[in-house]
């Protein structure tokens, strides 16, 4: 028999766990997808968002700032990275489609949000057997600062700088970029990310659930 899993959130990505939580008095079970990540011959798993670029750069810097704690560390790391504003060159293959170029950020979402409620892949559905990809083009620092607050509502995807895709197998290659998943360091690219449908059976708590935190996202038409 398959065991169901649940969790007690204890780190910075509380919003992701709130999304998965529902029915403390009347518990329910749900089978959800997971992402299998292969880096340097090692396989790891993710239920949420996998990222490269600015997000992973911020995490790398924050992990070195051991004299600060909590959100202060990540805020200072973000400000430092925005000042340096490095760009990485990527080759990303989504199923059979390849894209090459510079990007500020690449996110691959099974779940759609991370980092305190940032909806980086707002249309991600953890039960559809697909991964959502968000690619952010290079832009002046001032433009990026204006774009950043829109991530909390998911409206950043309306910007011409942001491109969204969907696929079941994604490879990310870059000469100098790290991969992070669910806030944890995975390793350097190249990385192969594959969705495994309905592999995780989870126990959910209805008490904390709201319609906007549903597993199932209504699909909107995309250009």
Stretches with model-predicted labels:
Residues 94-100, 125-126, 135-223:
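ATP/nucleoside-binding phosphotransfer catalytic cores, i.e., glycine-rich phosphate-binding loops
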Residues 106, 133:
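Rossmann-like adenosine-cofactor binding region
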Residues 1-103:
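Catalytic core of DAGKc-family lipid kinases
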Residues 51, 55, 107-121, 185:
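Glycine-rich phosphate/pyrophosphate-binding beta-alpha loops
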Residues 65-66, 121-124:
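Short, surface-exposed, charged loop/turn segments at secondary-structure junctions
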Residues 55-58, 100-102, 113-117, 141-144:
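Short acidic/glycine-rich loop or secondary-structure boundary segments that cap or lie
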Residues 5-7, 117-118, 145, 182:
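Short glycine-/acidic-enriched loop or helix-start segments at secondary-structure transitions
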């Amino acid at each position: 028999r398959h065991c169901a899993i649940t969790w007690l959130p204890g780190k910075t990505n509380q919003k992701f766990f709130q999304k998965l939580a529902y029915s403390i008095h009347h518990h329910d079970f749900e089978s959800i997808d997971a992402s299998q990540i292969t880096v340097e011959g090692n396989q790891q798993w993710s239920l949420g968002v996998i990222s490269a670029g600015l997000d992973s750069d911020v995490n790398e810097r924050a992990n070195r700032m051991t004299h600060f704690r909590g959100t202060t560390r990540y805020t200072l790391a973000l400000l430092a990275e925005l000042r340096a504003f490095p760009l990485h060159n990527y080759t990303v293959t989504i199923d059979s489609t390849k894209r090459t170029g510079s990007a500020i950020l690449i996110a691959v979402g099974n779940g759609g949000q991370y980092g305190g409620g940032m909806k980086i892949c707002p249309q991600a559905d953890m039960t559809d057997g697909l991964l959502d990809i968000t690619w952010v083009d290079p832009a002046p620092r001032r433009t990026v600062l204006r774009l950043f607050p829109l991530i909390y509502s998911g409206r950043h995807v309306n910007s011409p700088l942001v491109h969204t895709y969907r696929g079941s197998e994604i490879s990310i290659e870059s000469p100098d970029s790290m991969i992070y998943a669910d806030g944890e360091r995975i390793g350097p690219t190249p990385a192969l990310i594959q969705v495994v449908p309905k592999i995780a059976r989870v126990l959910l708590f209805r008490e904390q659930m709201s319609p906007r935190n549903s597993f199932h996202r209504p699909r909107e038409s995309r250009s």
